[in-house]
Amino acid sequence: MKKKIFFVALFAATLLCADLVVGATSKLIIRHAPQTQYNLSNTIQTLFHRTSDVLILGASRAHHSFDPRIIQRETGLSCFNGGRSGVKMDYFDLCVASYLKRCTPKLIVLDISSDMMEAPKDDQFKNLKCLYGMSGPLTQAMDSAYSPLERLKLQSNLYRNNRVFNEVLQLCLSKKCPELCGYQPLDGAYHTPHEVSTKPFSPDSVRLSRLNHIVSLCRSRNVRLVVTYAPTLRLTTRGCSQWLARYCKDRQIPFYDYSWSKKYYLHPELFKDEVHLNSHGADLFTHEFISVIQANLNDKS
């Protein structure tokens, strides 16, 4: 009996030590994480570290379409691309709230795709649990989304890092690329013509409330917000871009829709796939977008 108690106590002590070591290691890496091309790296930089005059936000389309190096060179303004694939508007609401705690950008560019405005099919925070307790806005969002049992589990460092500890460790081993400022260029050319969908679009009510909150945050801090719909080969006649045009018009938000721009959708060779520009396409698009940045900053002044 004493042996059983001893082994149980030893196992518990080992588990506790492992939990503490994993937690301390994870937090140390995250707090000093270099800029790499991993999604987690972009999240860490956006939530904790970066400041800039221009902030680009959006899902993978934004991540691959806006090159901050060109914006910085042409405007003289610092710029960071905080795009991340596979997340909803909730995530970008957190990004704006966190960024505005550190600095007041002159301009926030929010590229919105239809998937950002849809209800999540699974746990949208599953790959961000390692950041629980480190970011106030993110922690509050998780506490609101999760059950008491799940919140109890999140007190464990092993549980929080279970899915992504390998990715956390890779932050130290991956090639550092701070000069890209969050941008992720894509190589390769697509050769399939564009498609047109007539399916009507309707946003999820919760995601819409997150977008409304972003608009409110920007206005309360006197930050210029611009909404875009970057080039794509998936065109719509009653889709997200048409809905955004009405939404932005009602709220007097500048909106720039590039989905029906012939210089892009008639040239699939500028794309890596049907929704993402390749590096050459992103170069052309970012150069074109410079005039939008300058016009909105001049209008603000």
Please place each PLM-identified region on the residue numbering.
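Membrane-embedded segments
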Residues: L57, R61-D143
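Acidic-and-aromatic substrate-binding clefts and catalytic sites of carbohydrate-active enzymes
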Residues: G86-D90, S202-R207, L233-C240
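Hydrophobic membrane-insertion alpha-helices, especially the h-region
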Residues: F6-A24
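C-terminal regions of proteins
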Residues: Q242-N298
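Alpha-helical transmembrane signal-anchor/signal-peptide segments
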Residues: S26-Q45
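Secreted/periplasmic serine-hydrolase-like ester/acetyl group-modifying domain
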Residues: F125-V223
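Short hydrophobic beta-strand that contains or immediately precedes a catalytic carboxylate
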Residues: V54-G58, L277
